[in-house]
Structure formats: C-alpha cells, structure tokens
Amino acid sequence: MENPRSASLQKSWKFVRESLLLCLIAGRGEAQCDGCIEYCCDGVPPFCCSYYAYVGDVLSGTAISGIVFGVVFLMGAVAAVFLCVCMCVKNSRGSRVGVFSSTYINTVTQGYPGPPPPPYSYDHEMFPPDLRPPPYTPTVPRSANYSPPPPYPGFSRK
C-alpha cells in the first residue's frame, strides 16, 4: 500500500509541472496587440501593457498634481494639529508675549485714551474741490432712428 503523504506529494508535483509547462507553452506565443497597438511593449514575446508602462518612468501630469495635492494636504493637516496642540498648551499657562496682557486687550476694545478724532470732511481729499467730477445725472436713452444693417452677403432667402 502506498503512503498517502507521498501520493499527495506526487499530485502536487504533477500540478506544478503542468502549470509550468502551460506557462512555457503560452509564453512562446505572440501577444495579441490588435486592441492595444499604441501600447504594445517590446519584449520577447511582445506584450500589451498599460499607458504608464508604455511611457516608462516619466510621470504624467495627473500623477504629479496628485502627489503635490497629497503633500500639500498632509502639510495642512500637520499644521492644523500643531496649531491645536500649541493652543491647548498655551491655554494652560500665561502668554509669553507681553502685548496680549489684559490691559492691552481692554484698551483696544474700549477705545484709546484721549479725545476722539475729528469728523471726516472732504477737505482732506487728495484732489482740490474744483477737480472733482460733476454729480451724476442720468441720461435719457436715445431712440433708434437708424436703419437696420444690410443682409449677410453669403446667405439669400430665395
């Protein structure tokens, strides 16, 4: 009686040999490049390949723009996380910059000390008053007292 383990091993080797033989026989035939003649790659035998394999190592514009968009997007995400972490750390302690003290913020929100500025007048304009344009006066639309243009010379309605 034959060992069941050796029988399964023989079946496995038979499958490998037949698969290898099939690959070798199929590999010797010519590739069908009828549908992809523009992208038929050189080789023995010639084979159909994708556009990017046909172009080679040169990246297309779409691929480059996708890479640039991805890098910029990741940089923005990293910057947002960095700002969030910085703001959270900053809120736990006082500000290191002196201009953000509470007295400065109160001064800005309540107005500067001292008298208010003078009211705005046209005396401070760049041009003197005599160079200003005249006031706007709407004009009445003109009536159409002209004849229509002549007909197009290349087309006749006869």
From Swiss-Prot:
Entry superkingdom:
Eukaryota
Please give the Pfam families that the UniProt record associates with this protein.
CYYR1
The record places the following residue ranges in the Cytoplasmic compartment, namely 84-158
Could you say which residues form the signal peptide?
Answer: 1-31
Instruction: List the Extracellular topological domains.
Output: 32-62
Q: What is this entry's stated membrane topology?
A: Single-pass type I membrane protein
Indicate where this protein resides in the cell: Membrane
Q: Which InterPro entries match?
A: CYYR1 (IPR022640)
Give the region (Disordered) as residue ranges: 119-158
User: Chief localization class?
Assistant: membrane
UniProt protein name: Cysteine and tyrosine-rich protein 1
Q: Which organism encodes this protein?
A: Danio rerio (Zebrafish)
Q: What is the lineage of its organism?
A: Eukaryota, Metazoa, Chordata, Craniata, Vertebrata
